[in-house]
């Protein structure tokens, strides 16, 4: 009985550690995107999303393609 409880607790700890890693990485990526700007000729979103660096504007080239251009 003790072995089953120990195995259950270890499994729960491993599962929680595996589940926590992608969430932390996702938060880190979104913070980096919000803080930075996009350089010339990078994909952007005119309505939301990362902003282009100063002097550049997000221009819609087609329905599926918007880029930071001067």
UniProtKB/Swiss-Prot annotation:
Annotated protein name in UniProt: U2-agatoxin-Ao1a
UniProt note: domains: The presence of a 'disulfide through disulfide knot' structurally defines this protein as a knottin.
Superkingdom assignment: Eukaryota
Tissue and organ expression note: Expressed by the venom gland.
Signal peptide: 1-20
Main location: secreted
Chain positions listed as propeptide in the UniProt record: 21-34
GO cellular component: extracellular region
Function per UniProt: Insect active toxin causing rapid but reversible paralysis in crickets. No activity shown in mammals. Suppresses the excitatory postsynaptic potentials evoked in lobster neuromuscular synaptic preparations, possibly by blocking the presynaptic calcium channel. Induces instantaneous reversible paralysis when injected into crickets. Does not show effect on mammalian Cav2.1/CACNA1A, Cav2.2/CACNA1B and Cav2.3/CACNA1E.
Compartments where found: Secreted
Biological source species: Agelena orientalis
Misc. remarks from the entry: The primary structure of the mature peptide is identical to that of U2-agatoxin-Aop1a (Agelenin) from Allagelena opulenta (AC P31328).
Keyword terms: Amidation, Disulfide bond, Knottin, Neurotoxin, Secreted, Signal, Toxin
Annotated family: Belongs to the neurotoxin 01 (U2-agtx) family.
SUPFAM superfamilies reported for this sequence: omega toxin-like
Lineage, opening ranks: Eukaryota, Metazoa, Ecdysozoa, Arthropoda, Chelicerata
Post-translational modification Leucine amide, affected residues: 69
Disulfide pattern: 37-53, 44-58, 52-68
GO molecular function, one term: toxin activity
